Structure formats: structure tokens, C-alpha cells
């Protein structure tokens, strides 16, 4: 096997384990690593989004079999994701790379603080949206908003979807997380097409994304197995270490670029 392909397989396995073990978007691992390997921020995002197609599909199949996924909700959120992510190529082609990298760093830092201090979103006991029509509309709008920002930064949608759906629809996080993973299937496909249409990514990036994506499927499976045998304390320390390392590597690449 070519050493380049071998390294991509290792990256895919690692990001997949992160997704299965921590429930985090692969971008937290993939983007800093690809920046370190000399890829541009746009190409790193493109590779991260392509990887999401594979890991989110595999993860959603598992969630569906475990009856954790509401397909109806997922389709409406997915429609929004298709629409929102279609703008991601335009965003990456017009916004300065350094600004996007800083925003990625801020979001990673927020995630670190959230888990370090065990900050949890409260579910609205009396959600303002009761009508089924408006509930579906909220799902679509949430998908659009999340698709625009999350795919443009190569991150999962849970960080944005959990507080929005928790407030307006009263959804608990354990219901939103599988929904967010299913949403990523739609938004990542739309985002990849948008990246291609705006010449953000090329054939080499597509091939790299496929290698990493296929390897991430095995990584997700391994991550799920690992979480079953690890203690909560070890899981928490490992999660914070990954976020901390991601911030350090991203900040280093930002300063030296």
C-alpha cells in the first residue's frame, strides 16, 4: 500500500474512533491533521465533510437498528441540510481562510469548555411550537441554519441543533444527537457537491476523502466497542485531551501559516 494512502487510512480510523467513542464530528480531528500535512483550510474542510458521508451513514444505520432514530424528523432536518449546505462552497470561496480557521478554533474551544465544565442544555418543558406543520418547518429551518455553518466549517451539526430543537420543540439531546447524525448524510452530500461546483476541492481531495471516509467506518465500530469497556472518568479525560490537542494544532497552523 502507498504510504500516502496508508496515512489516510490511519487518519480515517482515528477520526472514526473519535466519532464512535466521543460522538464528536470528524472535523475536530481531521481538520487540524490535514492542516499539519500541508493541506489548505478549504481542502481540509472538504475532506472532513466527505468523511462525514461515510461515518454518518454507518452511524445512522446503527441508531435506526437500536430504534434511536426518528426517520420522519430526520428527513425534514435533512431537507434543510440539503438547502443550507448548498451555500457552503460559496462561503468557503469568498470568506478569508484565516477568519474561517479562527471561527473553527472558537467552536472547538467552546466544545472543550462545554465538556470541561459539564455544561448541559436544558430542554424546554413548555416548547412554544405545538403544530405539526410548524414543528416540521422548525426542523427544516434548523437544518438550513446548521447546514450553512456546520458544513462550511467541517463539523457535525449537534452543537447547533441541540439547543435550537431543545427550546422550540422540547427535544432531549438523546433524541437530537441521532437526528443530527442522520442530517449530516444529506448536508455532507450537498456540501461536497457545492465545494465541487465552486472549485473549492479537486479530484485529489475527493480521493483522499474517500480513503479517510471508508476507513472511518471501521473506526466508528471500534469507537463504539471502546466506549463499552471504558470508565466515565477515562472517557472524559480522553475527550478533553482530544479537544485540547485539536486546539493546539489548529492554533499552531494558524500562527505559522
Labelled PLM ranges:
Residues 27, 31, 47-50, 54, ...:
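Alpha-helical transmembrane segments of polytopic integral membrane proteins
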Residues 20, 33, 43-46, 164:
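Residue-level recognition of specific faces of alpha-helices
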Residues 19, 52-55, 59, 81, ...:
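Residue-level signal for conserved functional micro-sites within the alpha-helical transmembrane segments
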Residues 22-30, 154-164:
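Transmembrane helix boundary and interhelical junction motifs in multipass membrane proteins
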Residues 1-15, 35-37, 41, 62-153, ...:
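Juxtamembrane transmembrane-helix boundary motif
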Residues 14-28, 170:
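Single transmembrane alpha-helix segments in multi-pass membrane proteins
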Amino acid at each position: 500500500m502507498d504510504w500516502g494512502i496508508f496515512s489516510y487510512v490511519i487518519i480515517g480510523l482515528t477520526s472514526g474512533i473519535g466519532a464512535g467513542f466521543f460522538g464528536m464530528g470528524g472535523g475536530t480531528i481531521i481538520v487540524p491533521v490535514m492542516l499539519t500535512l500541508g493541506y489548505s483550510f478549504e481542502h481540509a474542510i472538504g475532506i472532513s465533510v466527505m468523511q462525514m458521508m461515510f461515518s454518518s451513514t454507518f452511524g445512522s444505520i446503527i441508531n435506526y437498528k437500536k430504534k434511536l432514530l426518528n426517520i420522519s424528523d430526520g428527513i425534514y432536518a435533512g431537507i434543510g441540510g440539503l438547502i443550507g449546505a448548498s451555500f457552503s462552497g460559496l462561503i468557503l470561496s469568498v470568506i478569508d481562510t484565516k477568519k474561517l480557521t479562527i471561527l473553527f478554533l472558537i467552536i472547538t474551544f467552546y466544545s472543550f469548555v462545554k465538556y470541561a465544565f459539564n455544561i448541559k442544555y436544558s430542554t424546554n418543558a413548555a416548547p412554544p411550537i405545538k403544530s405539526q406543520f410548524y414543528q416540521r418547518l422548525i426542523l427544516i429551518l434548523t437544518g438550513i441554519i446548521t447546514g450553512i455553518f456546520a458544513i462550511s466549517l467541517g463539523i457535525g451539526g449537534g452543537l447547533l441543533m441541540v439547543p435550537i430543537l431543545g427550546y422550540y420543540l422540547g427535544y432531549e439531546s438523546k433524541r437530537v444527537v441521532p437526528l443530527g447524525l442522520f442530517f449530516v448524510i444529506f448536508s455532507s452530500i450537498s456540501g461536497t457537491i457545492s465545494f465541487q461546483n465552486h472549485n473549492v476541492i479537486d479530484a485529489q481531495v475527493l480521493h483522499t476523502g474517500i480513503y479517510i471516509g471508508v476507513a472511518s467506518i471501521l473506526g466508528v465500530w471500534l469507537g463504539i466497542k471502546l466506549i463499552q469497556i471504558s470508565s466515565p472518568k477515562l472517557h472524559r479525560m480522553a475527550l478533553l485531551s482530544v479537544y485540547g490537542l485539536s486546539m493546539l494544532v489548529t492554533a499552531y497552523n494558524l500562527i505559522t501559516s
